[in-house]
């Protein structure tokens, strides 16, 4: 049987729950193309412009604006209206002199926060591998791979990056300009579970072997709760290191 290629259509009703779109106005919606974020954790650029920002009345208008290169994601012009945007992406509209950060609301749905500083972004280290020459490749949450060259690959102390840490990338250069370690006392942004969208400080880490680590956190008003490590996104010490 011949390969039909990737699907190009998506019905509105079974679309990801974190999409803030009307489910019954039309049968189909825009399906995100393959990219840095999975479909379940991203939103196509067309829907960002039309449904979230309201800067276009219909799909035709949104496509026109995008194809003209008037929308930047992490400082790069994206002309594909199906390009998937996801957590911590910085979306800029130079003509309107506006920038937005992709975050999550209290129901885990994708939303945009208006920001003033669009020159850097945070990326979570999901995994890391050793490449030729003993250097380190960081696999980040938004699909990118960042190479860290070590002066002396035989010295383990030169590798300061750990899984769960976050790196600060410059925009649009996409180079590492900072590092926030995972650990107690750090400020975290919660990306899943009952406290999704909240900020809280890590006050305890319970290591597990066969299951995800359990992290105990405390909000600004003193409420304590627990969640798994996968839902913890480090954003700084006492306050976020980027505009949120």
Swiss-Prot record:
Domain S4 RNA-binding: 43-106
InterPro entries cross-referenced by the UniProt entry: Rib_uL2_dom2 (IPR014722), Ribosomal_eS4 (IPR000876), Ribosomal_eS4_central_region (IPR013845), Ribosomal_eS4_central_sf (IPR038237), Ribosomal_eS4_KOW (IPR041982), Ribosomal_eS4_N (IPR013843), S4_RNA-bd (IPR002942), S4_RNA-bd_sf (IPR036986)
Ranges of biased composition (kind: Polar residues): 19-32
Cellular component terms (Gene Ontology): cytosolic small ribosomal subunit
GO BP: translation
Compositionally skewed regions (Basic residues) per UniProt: 1-14
Keywords: Ribonucleoprotein, Ribosomal protein, RNA-binding, rRNA-binding
Region listing for Disordered, in residue ranges: 1-36
One example GO MF annotation: structural constituent of ribosome
CDD domains, per database record: KOW_RPS4 (cd06087), S4 (cd00165)
NCBIfam families, A to Z: PRK04313.1
Similarity field: Belongs to the eukaryotic ribosomal protein eS4 family.
Protein name: Small ribosomal subunit protein eS4
Source organism of the structure: Methanococcus aeolicus (strain ATCC BAA-1280 / DSM 17508 / OCM 812 / Nankai-3)
Gene: rps4e
